Swiss-Prot record:
Residues annotated as domain HMA: 39-106
Residue ranges, annotated region (Disordered): 109-185
Ranges of biased composition (kind: Basic and acidic residues): 109-158
Modified residues (Cysteine methyl ester): C182
Chain segments annotated as coiled-coil in the UniProt record: none
Entry keyword set: Lipoprotein, Metal-binding, Methylation, Prenylation
Lipidation (S-farnesyl cysteine): C182
Protein name per Swiss-Prot or TrEMBL: Heavy metal-associated isoprenylated plant protein 11
InterPro entries referenced in this protein's UniProt entry, alphabetically: HIPP, HMA_dom
Length: 185
């Protein structure tokens, strides 16, 4: 198959053109056809008539294909292959080892559909911060009480500053089998 194309490099005004000649052999186009024919994520079940030794060889050949994601061999001579591969090429390779190879089932694996309307959780109606806040301590009143003594009135005022508390080391006694009850400071 010959394809001739003319293409101008420098635009329509220039007379320099180049001719590209593509020669595509039938063999390479055949392989290209099968490469493009590869199905995505297929599940193929082969029926094989083999003994244990040839079953291991068949598994080795199938594992050698690129795109095979899983392989399952059953006792009845069924071989289940999952992945992205060419069914025709795999059958051709298996026929070199086994006497009889047949494709029982070939189906594409469908990905689970995502839910178009995802479930959203409803958030409870929240009240404004002012209503939610709880008073945890009693606020001292600013108005002086007439029935209290003047010292009691002074104590009811809120403190503006406080002294930091200094932790004091407590003496501890060590008691044990070999100790005589000494005090450590």
């Amino acid at each position: 198959m010959y394809i001739n194309t003319h293409d101008s490099i420098f635009g329509a005004g220039n007379h320099k053109t180049f001719t590209f000649l593509y020669i595509i052999s039938l063999h390479s186009s055949y392989k290209l056809f099968h490469f493009l024919k590869m199905q995505q994520n297929t599940n193929v079940v082969f029926k094989l008539e083999v003994d244990e030794r040839k079953k291991k060889k068949a598994m080795k050949i199938v594992c050698g294909f690129s795109g095979v994601t899983s392989l399952n061999v059953m006792e009845e001579g069924k071989l289940t292959v999952t992945g992205e591969f060419d069914n025709y090429e795999m059958t051709k390779k298996l026929k070199k080892i086994c006497k009889h190879v047949a494709i029982i089932a070939a189906e594409p694996i469908r990905e689970p559909e995502q839910n178009r309307n995802p479930v959203t959780r409803r958030e409870p109606n929240r009240e404004p911060e002012q209503n939610r806040s709880r008073v945890t301590r009693r606020e001292p009143s600013r108005e002086p009480e007439p029935n209290r003594a003047p010292l009691a009135r002074r104590e009811s005022r809120p403190r503006t500053h406080s002294r930091p508390s200094i932790p004091h080391a407590r003496p501890s006694r060590v008691r044990g089998e070999n100790s005589d009850g000494c005090i450590i400071m």
